[in-house]
Amino acid sequence: MKGLLSLLLVGAANALAASYEPRSLTEDMLQGKEKEVWDAIKGEIPGAQLDDYFNPPTAHQREPDEKWDGKLEGKSVNTLWVEEGKDKPSGIEEYGMRFKTVDPSSLGVDNVTQYSGYLDNKKNGQHLFFWFFESRRDPQYDPVILWLNGGPGCSSMTSLFMELGPARVGQDLKLTRNPNSWNNRASIIFLDQPVNVGFSYGKSGAFNTPSASKDVFAFLTLFFKKFPQYALQDFHIAGESYAGHYIPFASYPPMACGKGGYSAVLDQPTCKAMEAAVPQCQKEIKRCYDKPTDVATCVKGAKFCKDALVRPYSRTGQSIYDIRGRCEDPKDLCYPILGWIAKYLNQRHVQKAIGAEVSHFKGCSNHISSQFFAHGDYNQPFHRKIPGILKDVNVLVYAGDADYICNWLGVKEWTEALQWPGRHIFRRKNLSVVYHSVNKWPLGRVKYHNGLAFLQVFKAGHRVPYDQPENALDFFNRWLAGEWTP
């Protein structure tokens, strides 16, 4: 089995009624962990507002089961959950899946077989939306991809209609076929997570990363049980941004100050101040690593590092997602197309065609991102999970060379710092130029060893398939074919 890098993000929720309209939160409504987190936030962030960190559930209207083409109950599936090398009850009986066949002619996204629906966590009231597209080539043999967006708090529908899906949305809200869609040679599942992102919903928002894996495990178990025709192919998990999760803060000063391949954005005094803040930032992060359950410690560290190493760049007006230009549209994360996608998906005929139960779609949720920050999730050492993954799964980590927030210097650094048997050989290897397999132009630089590969993609920002669609499809297909995996 091969796999692209991703960390799974889904949160916890409480019991949920069939329909819900949100109301404002007050401090007296917070209990347990939420109250602990809010106390930590107030202590570290003067003037913090409750609504910035704890959002009510997304408004929704659940459709009756008979409106769906089918459903599958978890209790009909016999499986185990493996945790720390031990078999444990999977809890799959707590889940169910509702689905429908999407008529390709209804929206014109693509003419391939499509399914959409919801994974339902009956115990916690989570409902995660998915949209599946069959491969354009040979779905019987082509691999299956699970795509997860980052943020945290951005819908995978944004990547579907902006980057690697079968169609792109224009300013006029019309669709154009994407000739460089990743479903040219693979079937793709786009999953909206965590809860209250995109078309997913639940009574309580997501707070951190670790609660994700069981929900995604349940989704995949039920999906492949219901659609066994896709269960025998190679399977990959792919994602971007926060899906990769960890970027060393020490990489920000050199990237902003002319050492990442592009001209400096900041002046020398600011660069020196940022460099001077790196040791303290690293100390704060280590404190969080040493006490990962201490929310106040992790929040304090994340705030210090963000204030010292990210805000100086943000204040310039330059896009944190592409060092080559200004932020065109701050309300849509510097990408105007995100606003077009939201308008397209908020059309009633679109929502009806895919069975969406959330009437107001937002591409990215600042509330979700703030919640993850508030729970200290930003500084958690999840990259330490990668060595265990490398025992069984090949991992490709790619980064656009013009991205600031997840810059290639930092991504390369953490791949070289991983504690795994191939570390020393991987570190010693130099980056070598990769050429497009057909057009023969240089698309990036790569290094790889024993199942781990790092790829620096030329002339690309944060969203690589958006900036370099041909090159992204080329390296994606080559990875699927087994290149860079020895």
UniProtKB/Swiss-Prot annotation:
<keyword id="KW-0964">Secreted</keyword>
<dbReference type="Pfam" id="PF00450">
    <property type="entry name" value="Peptidase_S10"/>
</dbReference>
<dbReference type="GO" id="GO:0000324">
    <property type="term" value="C:fungal-type vacuole"/>
</dbReference>
<protein>
    <recommendedName>
        <fullName>Carboxypeptidase Y homolog ARB_07161</fullName>
        <ecNumber>3.4.16.5</ecNumber>
    </recommendedName>
</protein>
<dbReference type="GO" id="GO:0005576">
    <property type="term" value="C:extracellular region"/>
</dbReference>
<keyword id="KW-0732">Signal</keyword>
<keyword id="KW-0378">Hydrolase</keyword>
<dbReference type="InterPro" id="IPR018202">
    <property type="entry name" value="Ser_caboxypep_ser_AS"/>
</dbReference>
<feature type="glycosylation site" description="N-linked (GlcNAc...) asparagine">
    <location>
        <position position="430"/>
    </location>
</feature>
<keyword id="KW-0325">Glycoprotein</keyword>
<dbReference type="GO" id="GO:0004185">
    <property type="term" value="F:serine-type carboxypeptidase activity"/>
</dbReference>
<feature type="glycosylation site" description="N-linked (GlcNAc...) asparagine">
    <location>
        <position position="111"/>
    </location>
</feature>
<feature type="disulfide bond">
    <location>
        <begin position="288"/>
        <end position="298"/>
    </location>
</feature>
<feature type="signal peptide">
    <location>
        <begin position="1"/>
        <end position="17"/>
    </location>
</feature>
<comment type="similarity">
    <text>Belongs to the peptidase S10 family.</text>
</comment>
<feature type="active site">
    <location>
        <position position="241"/>
    </location>
</feature>
<feature type="active site">
    <location>
        <position position="403"/>
    </location>
</feature>
<feature type="disulfide bond">
    <location>
        <begin position="281"/>
        <end position="305"/>
    </location>
</feature>
<comment type="function">
    <text>Involved in degradation of small peptides.</text>
</comment>
<keyword id="KW-0645">Protease</keyword>
<dbReference type="InterPro" id="IPR001563">
    <property type="entry name" value="Peptidase_S10"/>
</dbReference>
<dbReference type="InterPro" id="IPR029058">
    <property type="entry name" value="AB_hydrolase_fold"/>
</dbReference>
<keyword id="KW-0121">Carboxypeptidase</keyword>
<feature type="disulfide bond">
    <location>
        <begin position="327"/>
        <end position="334"/>
    </location>
</feature>
<dbReference type="GO" id="GO:0006508">
    <property type="term" value="P:proteolysis"/>
</dbReference>
<feature type="binding site">
    <location>
        <position position="406"/>
    </location>
    <ligand>
        <name>substrate</name>
    </ligand>
</feature>
<feature type="active site">
    <location>
        <position position="462"/>
    </location>
</feature>
<keyword id="KW-1015">Disulfide bond</keyword>
